[in-house]
Amino acid sequence: MAPALHWLLLWVGSGMLPAQGTHLGIRLPLRSGLAGPPLGLRLPRETDEESEEPGRRGSFVEMVDNLRGKSGQGYYVEMTVGSPPQTLNILVDTGSSNFAVGAAPHPFLHRYYQRQLSSTYRDLRKGVYVPYTQGKWEGELGTDLVSIPHGPNVTVRANIAAITESDKFFINGSNWEGILGLAYAEIARPDDSLEPFFDSLVKQTHIPNIFSLQLCGAGFPLNQTEALASVGGSMIIGGIDHSLYTGSLWYTPIRREWYYEVIIVRVEINGQDLKMDCKEYNYDKSIVDSGTTNLRLPKKVFEAAVKSIKAASSTEKFPDGFWLGEQLVCWQAGTTPWNIFPVISLYLMGEVTNQSFRITILPQQYLRPVEDVATSQDDCYKFAVSQSSTGTVMGAVIMEGFYVVFDRARKRIGFAVSACHVHDEFRTAAVEGPFVTADMEDCGYNIPQTDESTLMTIAYVMAAICALFMLPLCLMVCQWRCLRCLRHQHDDFADDISLLK
């Protein structure tokens, strides 16, 4: 989750996962309806096949299906740490940059990293503290040998934060014991001098500076059991597996190397433009974050989007708590009326000047199944679009429709339709383009920067103001002390007189 991670992840606000709670399910009758309107027309384009690059050829069979997890609790990969190797499940998080593992007993952990048992552990004698919007962890920094059994056949020495204390970080039943931050060093804790795991991997091996994620999500199977509540996917390290997507990959530039920041230039609900200043979509940033569950939107954008989604799905009446993510809606198993819900389209800046492409998100993505309250008679869902105070976050529910390529070498992120996304017979997720969009650079939000000279000027002005306030106070104190001295002398004289009497 960013360092300002929401409850990992799936918190809405930093990057953290949402806590599992008991929700009131709202039972709604099923009504028949037509499929949503067809997607808008796009401009003609030439074939957009990605170029082959060194390290992108070859087989990644051993990495396919190497992710596991539970709906709403994140995706994890198996890793080994230390000598002899200690096996741990590690949450995959593109919204933070620390590799951190539980290193002390915790009620929600079945196992943890025991540094004293590793002959290759090196203590850096430095602490680290990471707070989230809700939750936190702290620990001790060190290095050790790390490998990924269902990944590249290499072992690297990497920085590890051994988590010794935490609050609302680990999730009961999630089955992961640590977090693998895959973002850039700029947001690493305690500072950007701490090299993230993926940087160490690329530097110490010949693996190309690229990875890709296919998050497959969870739909309701016909024969539902607790075991089937899990989700899966693939993390391909060092390249692209063409079997994991259909169609072409479309790339958007990474605006800044801290989070995986991108620029959204337009938002549509069922083909209807929200018609907002595009800066609003990116206020104060837009990031791709596998460690957050929801699609999180800035306040104004969220309100406009919900208004449009409500209007499009008006054949059913939903409680206000549903749109706030506080209540669930349930239908009889297998009868969810997907067709009454609109698609959401996000237009992303393309690599070519004045061109964008759009990713189309289905209701099967933004209505998240909640298995722990569903019965064999009901399918229950949570609205997985929420309000954000830290910009737009394209979380796991968005990524579950697409194969997402984090091409760090070329500073770009690619999107293609995932071969495993959940859809119905009427609509599928889509990645389409190009579309002509002018002045896209203006859509990025620039955080105001104050130079040192301005700060010094402000400091001098504040000091002068303080001095002006302090001067009268000092004069008053001096005057009071003088009067007190005079009064004290007078009191002594009076006492002497009384004695004489």
From Swiss-Prot:
<keyword id="KW-0064">Aspartyl protease</keyword>
<dbReference type="GO" id="GO:0034205">
    <property type="term" value="P:amyloid-beta formation"/>
</dbReference>
<dbReference type="InterPro" id="IPR033121">
    <property type="entry name" value="PEPTIDASE_A1"/>
</dbReference>
<dbReference type="GO" id="GO:0042987">
    <property type="term" value="P:amyloid precursor protein catabolic process"/>
</dbReference>
<dbReference type="GO" id="GO:0050804">
    <property type="term" value="P:modulation of chemical synaptic transmission"/>
</dbReference>
<feature type="propeptide">
    <location>
        <begin position="22"/>
        <end position="45"/>
    </location>
</feature>
<feature type="modified residue" description="N6-acetyllysine">
    <location>
        <position position="279"/>
    </location>
</feature>
<feature type="glycosylation site" description="N-linked (GlcNAc...) asparagine">
    <location>
        <position position="172"/>
    </location>
</feature>
<keyword id="KW-0832">Ubl conjugation</keyword>
<dbReference type="GO" id="GO:0043025">
    <property type="term" value="C:neuronal cell body"/>
</dbReference>
<feature type="cross-link" description="Glycyl lysine isopeptide (Lys-Gly) (interchain with G-Cter in ubiquitin)">
    <location>
        <position position="501"/>
    </location>
</feature>
<dbReference type="GO" id="GO:0005802">
    <property type="term" value="C:trans-Golgi network"/>
</dbReference>
<feature type="topological domain" description="Cytoplasmic">
    <location>
        <begin position="479"/>
        <end position="501"/>
    </location>
</feature>
<keyword id="KW-0333">Golgi apparatus</keyword>
<feature type="short sequence motif" description="DXXLL">
    <location>
        <begin position="496"/>
        <end position="500"/>
    </location>
</feature>
<dbReference type="GO" id="GO:0048167">
    <property type="term" value="P:regulation of synaptic plasticity"/>
</dbReference>
<dbReference type="GO" id="GO:0004190">
    <property type="term" value="F:aspartic-type endopeptidase activity"/>
</dbReference>
<keyword id="KW-0325">Glycoprotein</keyword>
<keyword id="KW-0597">Phosphoprotein</keyword>
<dbReference type="GO" id="GO:0045121">
    <property type="term" value="C:membrane raft"/>
</dbReference>
<keyword id="KW-0812">Transmembrane</keyword>
<feature type="modified residue" description="N6-acetyllysine">
    <location>
        <position position="300"/>
    </location>
</feature>
<dbReference type="GO" id="GO:0009986">
    <property type="term" value="C:cell surface"/>
</dbReference>
<dbReference type="GO" id="GO:0005764">
    <property type="term" value="C:lysosome"/>
</dbReference>
<keyword id="KW-0732">Signal</keyword>
<feature type="active site">
    <location>
        <position position="289"/>
    </location>
</feature>
<feature type="lipid moiety-binding region" description="S-palmitoyl cysteine">
    <location>
        <position position="485"/>
    </location>
</feature>
<feature type="modified residue" description="N6-acetyllysine">
    <location>
        <position position="285"/>
    </location>
</feature>
<keyword id="KW-0645">Protease</keyword>
<feature type="transmembrane region" description="Helical">
    <location>
        <begin position="458"/>
        <end position="478"/>
    </location>
</feature>
<feature type="signal peptide">
    <location>
        <begin position="1"/>
        <end position="21"/>
    </location>
</feature>
<keyword id="KW-1003">Cell membrane</keyword>
<feature type="lipid moiety-binding region" description="S-palmitoyl cysteine">
    <location>
        <position position="482"/>
    </location>
</feature>
<comment type="similarity">
    <text>Belongs to the peptidase A1 family.</text>
</comment>
<keyword id="KW-0458">Lysosome</keyword>
<dbReference type="GO" id="GO:0030425">
    <property type="term" value="C:dendrite"/>
</dbReference>
<keyword id="KW-0378">Hydrolase</keyword>
<protein>
    <recommendedName>
        <fullName>Beta-secretase 1</fullName>
        <ecNumber>3.4.23.46</ecNumber>
    </recommendedName>
</protein>
<feature type="modified residue" description="N6-acetyllysine">
    <location>
        <position position="275"/>
    </location>
</feature>
<feature type="region of interest" description="Disordered">
    <location>
        <begin position="39"/>
        <end position="58"/>
    </location>
</feature>
<dbReference type="GO" id="GO:0071287">
    <property type="term" value="P:cellular response to manganese ion"/>
</dbReference>
<keyword id="KW-0472">Membrane</keyword>
